[in-house]
A protein has these predicted regions:
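Short, flexible, surface-exposed loop segments at domain boundaries
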Residues: 2-135, 140-172
Length: 172
């Protein structure tokens, strides 16, 4: 009986922990404001929605070595964020540009979870293979859980490192 009580307690605690986890989502848009005092970045998404995103010491940056200082009004960015409304927190921010984070759109041809790669066929018919990061793998996992895999339309946000295309963000 004592073991049953422990099991019930464990299951309840695990449920609370799972509920407390925030869903991660991707926002692509343009920086309209950077506030260094409140450590926030306002990003106007493609659909016109403005997201006030809190940055922390845990926030990582791609495409800029200056971190928050590298983001200016008018900068095109992609953001991994948690939370909604006034509680949006940036986990990773990518500055989009020819010498930083690049964008590729297409259709998923193949996903290899073991090798952490995805092959995407572009509109011109060429196939590109992307290695993906752990964070991007979570995007992939959420999309596959929602039924998206081979044949899904995808936008890949990537950098080129040592001759490889490294996907940091996926948007399905």
């Amino acid at each position: 009986m004592r073991y049953l009580g422990s099991l019930v307690l464990f299951v309840c605690l695990a449920g609370v922990i799972c509920v407390a986890q925030d869903v991660v989502s991707v926002v692509h848009g343009t920086v309209t404001k950077v506030d260094h005092d409140t450590k926030t970045v306002v990003v106007k998404a493609e659909d016109g929605t403005e997201h006030t995103i809190k940055v922390t010491g845990q926030t990582t940056y791609k495409g800029t070595k200056e971190g928050l200082d590298g983001l200016k009004e008018g900068t095109e960015v992609v953001v991994h964020k948690t939370g909604t409304g006034a509680k949006e927190t940036g986990m990773e921010i990518g500055k989009i540009g020819k010498d930083s984070v690049k964008v590729s759109e297409g259709t998923v041809v193949k996903v290899d979870h073991g090798a952490k790669t995805v092959v995407v066929k572009g509109a011109d018919g060429t196939e590109k293979t992307f290695d993906y990061t752990e964070t991007a793998g979570k995007d992939m996992g959420q999309a596959i859980g929602a039924g998206a895999e081979k044949g899904a339309k995808v936008t890949v946000y990537y950098t080129e490192e040592s001759g490889k295309k490294i996907a940091h963000f996926f948007r399905f």
